Amino acid sequence: MQKYDIAIIGGGVLGTTISYWLSTLYDLKICLIEKEHDVALHSSTRNSGVIHYPFYIDPKKKKNFARAAFLSHDMWKVLANENNIPWVQGGTIEIALDEEQHKTLEKYMVLGKENGLTEEDISILDSNELKQKEPNLNCHSGLYCTKEGSTNYGLLTKAVSELSKKNGTNFLLKHNVKYVEETSDQANIIFSDNSSLTANFVINCAGGNSLDVAKKFRLLKDYSDLHFRGEYWVADSNIANLVKTNIYTVPRYPEFPFLDPHWIKRANGETEIGPNAVPVDSPEAYDSFITDIPTVLSKITDIVTGSTKKLLLNTDFISLVSKEFLSSISKSAMVE
């Protein structure tokens, strides 16, 4: 049986980069466990590809998150350039439609500067200034961030995995965690093929499956999760070049972890509108709303007995979910 100092479960961008940093900083025996045949086959590839800079993150509430977003920007850029991975820094404009939303942009300016951004990185433009930059954009005002743009995080994750392998990390692909046996000082991880390994320390980076993995360690038993699929519409060629930058709007539902659909200039040259947030029964329900009947029944049971049941009584949440569901079958609903 293989023995490791650290086992990381999940081969997405988070698990892969953690494996790289740990293998760079420490002389440890490390493995990364991934159930798929390669890294970054799920959320790390299936995303907008937008390069985010922390002008909207409150450093008092999310200090480490804001700091990581600020410091990692140039690291990702260097890695992209070294590996010929697309990195298009065309900028992002977050627009306000009225004076009330403009106040949110002013708040973002303060947060951005607290996070280390300069006046060259972010600025607020009025409607006339925006017209000069983007003639087809009609709004009250906008916050322009020059450091944002688009890349391919799936390719970046694979590049990081190669660096981690050179440091000695063992990538265990096609290894699906079946169950876990714990002792006082280590975890015995058993896989679907009944092979196993032991680790002194385990890091859970399983993305949409993180709660399922945690429960295999008999943690968070009373918690449940909800899964949402983000969908994008590819803009037709006759409208794809209406604007040159990513366009976001001030979120209408800041109390929920959803963004309104936005205008995305992809690193591959395509223009897309999205994403929405369509409720599905599992984190990998990419082509349908329902994976299978047992999965649906299990998810319903989790929701009505677990921590997410209170959302079912929130009328704002139910209204938002209904609109998101409609946007999955209607382009006009997505645009609206």
Language model features with spans:
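Helical element adjacent to the flavin cofactor pocket in flavoenzyme catalytic cores
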Residues: 143-201
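Short beta-strand to alpha-helix junction loop
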Residues: 60, 64-70, 95-105, 143-163, ...
